[in-house]
Amino acid sequence: MQYQKVLQMLNCIPYLSVGLDVGADFTWMSIMLPNGTLTGKPFKIIHSDPQSRELAVTKIKEAQEMYSLKSRCFLESTGIYHIPLLCFLHDKGFDCSVINPIITKNSTN
């Protein structure tokens, strides 16, 4: 019973949602507050540019500090394209989940 209570409490903890729309060469990243408001404009991450990836990490960390919230990163499952970015963000200490776009689309119908 205690385990279920802890899980329910964790689901109530607000967090920043980092949405990552993954493509073959680049990814669009948006950071959203718990109330659904975007923290800024979408940011383009160029997969082949290490500085671009590091800047994305900086933007996430700045948002975490500004709003005093942890973040959760949600990447679209795109064959193999999401894997390097998923590993990169996980190695940087971010909580990441891969979302299947077909399942997500079907759940809205």
Question: Where are the predicted features?
Answer:
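Phosphate- and other anionic-substrate recognition elements at nucleic-acid/protein interfaces
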Residues: 1-109
